[in-house]
Amino acid sequence: MSDLKAIQARSLEMAEYFVAFCKEHDLLCYLCGGGAIGALRNKGFIPWDDDLDFFMPRKDYEKLAELWLQYADERYFLSKSSKDYVDRNLFITIRDKETTCIKPYQQDLDLPHGLALDVLPLDYYPKNPAERKKQVHWALIYSLFCAQTIPEKHGALMKWGSTILLGLTPKSLRYRIWKKAEKEMTKYGPAESDGITELCSGPGYMKKKYPIQAFEDNIFLPFEGTEMPIPVGYDAYLSTAFGDYMTPPPADKQVPHHDAIIADMDKSYTEYMGECNARKN
Protein backbone atom coordinates (compact mmCIF):
# COMPACT_ATOMS: atom_id res chain seq x y z
CA MET A 1 0.00 0.00 0.00
CA SER A 2 1.28 3.46 -0.89
CA ASP A 3 1.47 6.14 1.79
CA LEU A 4 -0.42 9.44 1.74
CA LYS A 5 2.48 11.43 0.28
CA ALA A 6 2.77 9.05 -2.67
CA ILE A 7 -0.97 9.30 -3.33
CA GLN A 8 -0.83 13.10 -3.14
CA ALA A 9 2.11 13.20 -5.57
CA ARG A 10 0.25 11.11 -8.15
CA SER A 11 -2.93 13.14 -7.62
CA LEU A 12 -1.01 16.34 -8.29
CA GLU A 13 0.55 14.85 -11.41
CA MET A 14 -2.92 13.97 -12.70
CA ALA A 15 -4.29 17.40 -11.82
CA GLU A 16 -1.48 19.16 -13.68
CA TYR A 17 -2.21 17.11 -16.79
CA PHE A 18 -5.94 17.74 -16.47
CA VAL A 19 -5.57 21.51 -16.03
CA ALA A 20 -3.15 21.72 -18.98
CA PHE A 21 -5.63 19.77 -21.12
CA CYS A 22 -8.44 22.14 -20.14
CA LYS A 23 -6.28 25.18 -20.96
CA GLU A 24 -5.36 23.75 -24.35
CA HIS A 25 -9.00 23.15 -25.24
CA ASP A 26 -10.46 26.34 -23.69
CA LEU A 27 -12.38 24.51 -20.98
CA LEU A 28 -13.09 26.20 -17.66
CA CYS A 29 -12.21 24.21 -14.54
CA TYR A 30 -11.50 24.90 -10.89
CA LEU A 31 -10.49 22.94 -7.81
CA CYS A 32 -13.40 22.39 -5.44
CA GLY A 33 -13.84 21.22 -1.87
CA GLY A 34 -10.66 20.35 0.00
CA GLY A 35 -8.44 21.14 -2.98
CA ALA A 36 -9.68 24.74 -3.15
CA ILE A 37 -9.42 25.11 0.63
CA GLY A 38 -5.90 23.69 0.53
CA ALA A 39 -4.86 26.18 -2.15
CA LEU A 40 -5.97 29.04 0.10
CA ARG A 41 -4.99 27.68 3.50
CA ASN A 42 -1.92 25.57 2.78
CA LYS A 43 -0.75 26.56 -0.72
CA GLY A 44 -1.15 22.87 -1.48
CA PHE A 45 -2.88 19.80 -0.15
CA ILE A 46 -4.70 19.88 3.14
CA PRO A 47 -2.17 17.69 5.01
CA TRP A 48 -4.56 14.77 5.51
CA ASP A 49 -6.35 15.03 2.15
CA ASP A 50 -5.75 12.26 -0.39
CA ASP A 51 -7.28 13.51 -3.64
CA LEU A 52 -8.12 16.52 -5.81
CA ASP A 53 -11.57 17.18 -7.25
CA PHE A 54 -12.62 19.68 -9.91
CA PHE A 55 -15.77 21.55 -10.87
CA MET A 56 -16.63 22.44 -14.46
CA PRO A 57 -19.62 24.35 -15.85
CA ARG A 58 -21.98 21.86 -17.48
CA LYS A 59 -21.21 22.94 -21.07
CA ASP A 60 -17.46 22.53 -20.52
CA TYR A 61 -18.02 19.25 -18.69
CA GLU A 62 -19.89 17.80 -21.68
CA LYS A 63 -17.20 19.01 -24.09
CA LEU A 64 -14.53 17.40 -21.92
CA ALA A 65 -16.02 13.93 -22.40
CA GLU A 66 -15.85 14.33 -26.19
CA LEU A 67 -12.42 15.95 -26.40
CA TRP A 68 -10.74 13.56 -23.95
CA LEU A 69 -11.48 10.54 -26.11
CA GLN A 70 -9.85 12.26 -29.10
CA TYR A 71 -6.83 14.02 -27.64
CA ALA A 72 -5.88 12.82 -24.15
CA ASP A 73 -2.94 10.60 -23.25
CA GLU A 74 -4.11 6.96 -23.19
CA ARG A 75 -2.61 6.60 -19.73
CA TYR A 76 -5.55 8.60 -18.37
CA PHE A 77 -8.92 6.91 -18.83
CA LEU A 78 -12.10 8.98 -18.70
CA SER A 79 -14.77 6.97 -16.91
CA LYS A 80 -18.38 8.07 -17.42
CA SER A 81 -21.41 5.84 -17.04
CA SER A 82 -23.35 5.07 -20.21
CA LYS A 83 -25.96 2.61 -21.44
CA ASP A 84 -23.56 -0.35 -21.39
CA TYR A 85 -21.06 0.86 -18.78
CA VAL A 86 -21.91 1.72 -15.16
CA ASP A 87 -19.12 2.77 -12.79
CA ARG A 88 -21.45 3.69 -9.88
CA ASN A 89 -20.42 7.35 -9.94
CA LEU A 90 -22.63 10.32 -10.81
CA PHE A 91 -19.85 12.21 -12.55
CA ILE A 92 -16.73 11.83 -14.67
CA THR A 93 -13.60 10.37 -13.14
CA ILE A 94 -10.17 10.41 -14.76
CA ARG A 95 -8.24 7.23 -13.91
CA ASP A 96 -4.46 6.81 -14.01
CA LYS A 97 -4.00 3.35 -15.53
CA GLU A 98 -0.41 3.10 -14.27
CA THR A 99 -1.59 3.07 -10.64
CA THR A 100 -3.95 1.04 -8.45
CA CYS A 101 -6.75 2.37 -6.27
CA ILE A 102 -9.52 -0.20 -5.82
CA LYS A 103 -12.56 1.15 -3.97
CA PRO A 104 -14.95 -1.17 -2.08
CA TYR A 105 -18.01 -0.05 -4.04
CA GLN A 106 -16.30 -0.79 -7.37
CA GLN A 107 -14.26 -3.90 -6.59
CA ASP A 108 -16.61 -6.19 -8.54
CA LEU A 109 -16.63 -4.00 -11.67
CA ASP A 110 -14.55 -4.46 -14.80
CA LEU A 111 -13.00 -1.00 -15.18
CA PRO A 112 -9.58 0.66 -14.89
CA HIS A 113 -9.02 0.69 -11.12
CA GLY A 114 -6.41 3.44 -11.19
CA LEU A 115 -6.17 6.50 -8.94
CA ALA A 116 -9.13 8.77 -9.70
CA LEU A 117 -9.55 12.48 -10.21
CA ASP A 118 -13.22 13.46 -9.84
CA VAL A 119 -14.76 16.00 -12.22
CA LEU A 120 -18.18 17.31 -11.18
CA PRO A 121 -20.53 19.46 -13.28
CA LEU A 122 -22.13 22.69 -12.11
CA ASP A 123 -25.69 23.52 -13.15
CA TYR A 124 -28.00 26.51 -13.01
CA TYR A 125 -30.38 26.95 -10.07
CA PRO A 126 -33.82 28.08 -11.36
CA LYS A 127 -35.43 31.17 -9.80
CA ASN A 128 -38.92 29.70 -9.74
CA PRO A 129 -39.42 27.68 -6.51
CA ALA A 130 -41.66 25.15 -8.25
CA GLU A 131 -39.06 24.59 -10.95
CA ARG A 132 -36.37 24.24 -8.31
CA LYS A 133 -38.39 21.50 -6.58
CA LYS A 134 -38.71 19.71 -9.91
CA GLN A 135 -34.97 20.03 -10.46
CA VAL A 136 -34.15 18.42 -7.10
CA HIS A 137 -36.73 15.70 -7.75
CA TRP A 138 -35.12 14.85 -11.09
CA ALA A 139 -31.63 15.06 -9.57
CA LEU A 140 -32.53 12.45 -6.96
CA ILE A 141 -33.92 10.16 -9.66
CA TYR A 142 -30.76 10.70 -11.70
CA SER A 143 -28.59 9.87 -8.68
CA LEU A 144 -30.34 6.58 -8.05
CA PHE A 145 -30.57 5.31 -11.61
CA CYS A 146 -27.15 6.52 -12.74
CA ALA A 147 -25.23 5.04 -9.79
CA GLN A 148 -27.57 2.02 -9.60
CA THR A 149 -26.47 1.62 -6.00
CA ILE A 150 -28.52 1.68 -2.80
CA PRO A 151 -27.55 4.79 -0.75
CA GLU A 152 -26.31 3.78 2.70
CA LYS A 153 -25.67 7.17 4.32
CA HIS A 154 -28.88 9.13 3.73
CA GLY A 155 -31.36 7.56 6.11
CA ALA A 156 -33.47 4.41 6.31
CA LEU A 157 -36.37 5.86 4.31
CA MET A 158 -34.22 6.74 1.31
CA LYS A 159 -32.49 3.35 1.50
CA TRP A 160 -35.85 1.54 1.61
CA GLY A 161 -37.37 3.55 -1.22
CA SER A 162 -34.28 3.20 -3.39
CA THR A 163 -34.20 -0.56 -2.87
CA ILE A 164 -37.81 -0.87 -4.05
CA LEU A 165 -37.39 1.46 -7.05
CA LEU A 166 -34.25 -0.25 -8.32
CA GLY A 167 -35.69 -3.68 -7.64
CA LEU A 168 -38.81 -2.96 -9.67
CA THR A 169 -37.00 -1.35 -12.60
CA PRO A 170 -35.46 -3.64 -15.24
CA LYS A 171 -31.87 -2.83 -16.16
CA SER A 172 -33.03 -2.13 -19.70
CA LEU A 173 -35.10 0.82 -18.43
CA ARG A 174 -32.65 2.31 -15.94
CA TYR A 175 -30.56 4.09 -18.56
CA ARG A 176 -33.62 5.66 -20.19
CA ILE A 177 -34.87 6.90 -16.81
CA TRP A 178 -31.55 8.44 -15.82
CA LYS A 179 -31.08 10.15 -19.20
CA LYS A 180 -34.59 11.63 -18.93
CA ALA A 181 -33.79 12.83 -15.40
CA GLU A 182 -30.46 14.29 -16.52
CA LYS A 183 -32.15 16.20 -19.34
CA GLU A 184 -34.80 17.64 -17.03
CA MET A 185 -32.45 18.66 -14.21
CA THR A 186 -29.97 20.40 -16.53
CA LYS A 187 -32.41 22.22 -18.84
CA TYR A 188 -32.20 25.60 -17.10
CA GLY A 189 -30.07 28.45 -18.41
CA PRO A 190 -28.91 31.81 -17.02
CA ALA A 191 -32.08 33.65 -18.11
CA GLU A 192 -34.35 31.67 -15.77
CA SER A 193 -31.79 31.15 -12.98
CA ASP A 194 -30.31 33.16 -10.14
CA GLY A 195 -27.70 30.74 -8.86
CA ILE A 196 -25.43 27.75 -9.43
CA THR A 197 -25.82 24.37 -7.76
CA GLU A 198 -24.24 20.91 -7.49
CA LEU A 199 -26.57 18.17 -8.67
CA CYS A 200 -24.06 15.31 -8.83
CA SER A 201 -22.44 15.61 -5.39
CA GLY A 202 -25.13 13.93 -3.32
CA PRO A 203 -28.36 15.09 -1.61
CA GLY A 204 -26.60 17.42 0.85
CA TYR A 205 -24.78 19.50 -1.73
CA MET A 206 -27.63 19.67 -4.23
CA LYS A 207 -29.40 21.91 -1.70
CA LYS A 208 -26.65 24.53 -1.99
CA LYS A 209 -27.08 27.73 -3.99
CA TYR A 210 -24.04 29.73 -5.06
CA PRO A 211 -23.83 33.08 -6.90
CA ILE A 212 -23.52 32.71 -10.66
CA GLN A 213 -20.65 35.20 -10.62
CA ALA A 214 -18.59 32.93 -8.34
CA PHE A 215 -17.96 30.53 -11.21
CA GLU A 216 -17.71 32.89 -14.18
CA ASP A 217 -13.93 32.48 -14.27
CA ASN A 218 -11.01 30.99 -12.36
CA ILE A 219 -7.88 32.34 -10.74
CA PHE A 220 -4.62 30.47 -10.30
CA LEU A 221 -2.97 30.15 -6.89
CA PRO A 222 0.31 28.53 -5.76
CA PHE A 223 -0.14 24.82 -5.10
CA GLU A 224 2.68 22.43 -4.17
CA GLY A 225 5.24 24.22 -6.34
CA THR A 226 2.90 24.73 -9.27
CA GLU A 227 -0.37 26.65 -9.73
CA MET A 228 -3.94 25.39 -9.63
CA PRO A 229 -7.23 27.12 -10.52
CA ILE A 230 -10.00 27.91 -8.04
CA PRO A 231 -13.30 29.75 -8.65
CA VAL A 232 -12.95 33.52 -8.95
CA GLY A 233 -15.67 33.84 -6.31
CA TYR A 234 -14.09 31.27 -4.03
CA ASP A 235 -15.18 32.93 -0.78
CA ALA A 236 -18.88 32.96 -1.71
CA TYR A 237 -18.64 29.32 -2.79
CA LEU A 238 -16.59 27.95 0.10
CA SER A 239 -18.35 29.88 2.88
CA THR A 240 -21.73 28.66 1.60
CA ALA A 241 -20.55 25.07 1.24
CA PHE A 242 -18.35 24.76 4.34
CA GLY A 243 -18.81 27.78 6.62
CA ASP A 244 -15.55 28.94 8.25
CA TYR A 245 -13.34 27.14 5.75
CA MET A 246 -10.08 28.81 6.84
CA THR A 247 -10.23 27.24 10.30
CA PRO A 248 -8.99 23.62 10.34
CA PRO A 249 -11.35 21.02 11.84
CA PRO A 250 -10.64 19.33 15.20
CA ALA A 251 -7.72 16.90 15.24
CA ASP A 252 -10.00 13.85 15.28
CA LYS A 253 -11.54 15.01 11.97
CA GLN A 254 -8.19 15.44 10.23
CA VAL A 255 -8.23 12.09 8.47
CA PRO A 256 -8.62 11.00 4.82
CA HIS A 257 -12.25 10.46 3.86
CA HIS A 258 -11.73 7.92 1.09
CA ASP A 259 -11.09 4.25 1.67
CA ALA A 260 -9.37 1.86 -0.72
CA ILE A 261 -8.94 -1.89 -0.60
CA ILE A 262 -5.63 -1.56 -2.44
CA ALA A 263 -3.72 1.67 -3.15
CA ASP A 264 -0.42 1.29 -5.00
CA MET A 265 1.01 4.25 -6.88
CA ASP A 266 3.87 2.23 -8.37
CA LYS A 267 1.93 -0.63 -9.99
CA SER A 268 -0.87 -0.76 -12.52
CA TYR A 269 -4.22 -2.10 -11.36
CA THR A 270 -3.78 -4.88 -13.93
CA GLU A 271 -1.22 -6.50 -11.62
CA TYR A 272 -3.88 -6.81 -8.92
CA MET A 273 -6.81 -8.04 -10.99
CA GLY A 274 -6.48 -11.61 -9.76
CA GLU A 275 -6.69 -10.44 -6.17
CA CYS A 276 -9.61 -8.16 -7.00
CA ASN A 277 -11.49 -10.97 -8.75
CA ALA A 278 -10.93 -13.24 -5.76
CA ARG A 279 -12.70 -10.68 -3.57
CA LYS A 280 -15.83 -10.91 -5.73
CA ASN A 281 -16.28 -14.59 -4.86
At which residue positions do the language-model features occur?
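A short secondary-structure junction signal
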Residues: P129-K134
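Active-site nucleotide-donor binding segment shared across nucleotidyl transfer reactions
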Residues: V19-L52, M56, Y61-E62, Q213, ...
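Short amphipathic alpha-helical patches
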Residues: F45-I46, D60, S143, I261-D266
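Short, His- and charge-rich active-site/binding loops that engage polyanionic ligands
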Residues: V136-A139
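Conserved catalytic core of two-metal-ion nucleotidyltransferases
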Residues: S2-H25, W68-K127, A147-A241, P248-N281
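Conserved SAM-binding loop
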Residues: L64-E66
